[in-house]
Amino acid sequence: IDNCKTETNFFIDKDRIIKVNEELNKNNSYKIVIGAGSSGPTTRWGSSNFADLINNLNKLGDYFFFILCGPNEKKIENEISSKISKNNFLTLSDKTIYDLIPYLGISDMYVGNDSFGSHIVSQCGKKSIVFLLDAPKAYTDYSKNYYRILPEGYDINKITHGTNADPNLISVNSVIEVINKLKN
């Protein structure tokens, strides 16, 4: 989407942003929200894909990752964090929605499943890369900040609930290419 007449904006109190930046010691790394949580198993890219993505990005540059999963998705969070070779991440599953919003707001980008975090990051005016595995494009049609990645061989107009696309049809390398393109 080049221009969206209904583009929304999400504003976060400056004091809350300052507090989170202080907690992170004003970390100047490129901050990516890893949206590993989702509404169900058919919409998830998979913990091993996310861990591989993080480890590959760590070889390429200076990054910091916020791993976003719901409180009932700690297993996914642990599967990812246990495989990360560098200690440059923060898990957010123990935070309330109110408390985690500033972390999303200070991020530079969202990469992950179609979930609430992608909406917050895009509404903060940041790029939001979303994997459409089992969700219609309408979920991301409302913002110019969305970039959608589809499983190889799929038509965006034919993906909907019940598509159940194989998450491995989205390669880690293709995601890195999109990140690099949008980052610069």
Regions found by a protein language model. Give the residues of each.
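Mid-sequence helix-capping/hinge segment at a functional interface
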Residues: 1-43
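Pocket-edge positions in alpha/beta enzyme catalytic cores
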Residues: 12, 42, 92, 164-167
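Electropositive phosphate-/nucleotide-binding environments in soluble metabolic enzymes
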Residues: 14, 30, 47, 169-173
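Donor-binding and catalytic core of enzymes assembling or modifying cell-surface/extracellular glycoconjugates
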Residues: 47-133
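Nucleotide-sugar donor-binding patch of glycosyltransferase catalytic domains
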Residues: 122-183
